């Protein structure tokens, strides 16, 4: 199985060649920086540019996880899943999907956008102290 992983595209993907693979993992910060604080603009870019770009890549399945600049993805899994319905793109937000290779072997792909708080970004959380675990 061949897996390609990319991140921190910030909307710059034209001219970027993705090699043929089984899985593409896009690990956050997809939205252009100029849209990061605007849900409607981010949604329009996602629907009209990002989804078509992903769908034309030589990849069987795409797994997308949000990043700290992807504010438009926060708390919107249902909406994002509606946009992606019928495509080969799976949005993972503390969730998983199964992927079956051509031999029938099944893999579980898990994705989480969460990261320790370090500013006013998306998907931040306060880490618990060791005593709180």
Where are these regions (language model features)?
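Beta-strand-turn-beta hairpins that frame and shape the catalytic cleft
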Residues: 1-4, 96-111
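Binuclear metal-dependent hydrolase catalytic cores centered on His/Asp/Glu-rich metal-binding motifs
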Residues: 105-133
């Amino acid at each position: 199985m061949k897996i390609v992983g990319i991140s921190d595209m910030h909307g710059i993907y034209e001219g970027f060649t993705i090699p043929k693979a089984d899985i593409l993992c896009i690990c956050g910060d997809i939205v252009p920086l100029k849209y990061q604080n605007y849900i409607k603009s981010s949604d329009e870019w996602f629907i009209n540019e990002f989804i078509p770009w992903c769908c034309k890549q030589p990849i069987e399945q795409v797994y997308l996880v949000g990043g700290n600049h992807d504010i438009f993805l926060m708390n919107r899994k249902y909406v994002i899943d509606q946009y992606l319905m019928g495509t080969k793109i799976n949005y993972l937000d503390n969730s998983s999907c199964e992927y079956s290779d051509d031999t029938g072997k099944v893999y579980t792909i898990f994705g989480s956008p969460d990261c320790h708080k370090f500013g006013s970004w998306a998907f931040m959380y306060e880490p618990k102290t060791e005593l709180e675990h």
